[in-house]
Amino acid sequence: MRRAIAFLMILWYYSNYCMEIARGSGVAEIAWEITESSEYQKRRREIVLGIGRAATREFNPESLYRLVDRYVASGVADDILKERGDTDKAPEDKILKLILKFIQFMPYWICAEEKLESYRNGVFYERNNKIREKETVVSFNKVVRDIISEGQYTRKSELISDVQGAMDCLGYGDEEIENAYKFLAYVINGMRHEIAAEIALRKTKGVRAVYTTGIDDDLAGIDLIVEYKDNYGGEHIIGLDIKSTPDSARNANNSDRDKGRHAIWSGFDHRRGDFGFYEDNLMPSNKAVKRVRSFYETELEKIVRKEVSRHKKK
């Protein structure tokens, strides 16, 4: 009963002050509100007492105490999401839901990123473990993408700074925050190129529809699915893997790839100021979108010719 009342109080706060939160600092502010909730305090107290009872001379509980805040906050965020269900009545509700998902995923995402980095550096891994870590990362990336798309933040530095504030509130150490900065900067850059590509493609001649993909397609290397009608009236479904540079697209296409899936540069160039003079904007300029449309017209026709040629050889 008391637990239900605690959740209702949290939900009441968000429903009454959601507009203020949506215009405020977002992730850090909501993380702080969670840590101030009675449900969070109760869970944390129980876990800390359990750690204290389990501690021995050979086991220093301090290292575990630092982990408690982030996972308790993650659990509370998860429960609030379950309590809310599908209640996106207003844009502010959707933003709140995304930020709660962000806080829910964050400790698992950082752990997954660190493990994947160790695998790249030669640490032995089992294939199933690597797939599981990738699924966690992709799920988190999609939350970041949605937060950017909703316009909660306008600048990359603003979003990263707010996340760092949330991490500080949730007991992360300096080294963990530094690692998260590196991982998050990479994620944000990739997601803003995906969003920019989607915006430009929707305005490109011959493009009938553009769809963002689910986790399975993303893991298979498909970020966007495009319905395209070529210059001769032929209709095509094209899976695109959006890359932030021409070199990364070229390298991806030179590797083994399933047919019908194509890596392509987003067409947006930081050096040209497509994401602002300081490369800090999360959304591309209208001028850049207009320029990139012609780039996609050319690239989509190239992809179609390549696919037609491949089918003729069968």
Map each language-model feature to its residues.
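Charged, low-complexity, intrinsically disordered terminal regions
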Residues: 107, 130, 134-145, 155-167, ...
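Nuclease-adjacent, charged terminal/linker segments that flank catalytic cores
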Residues: 5-162
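Catalytic centers of nucleases
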Residues: 192-250
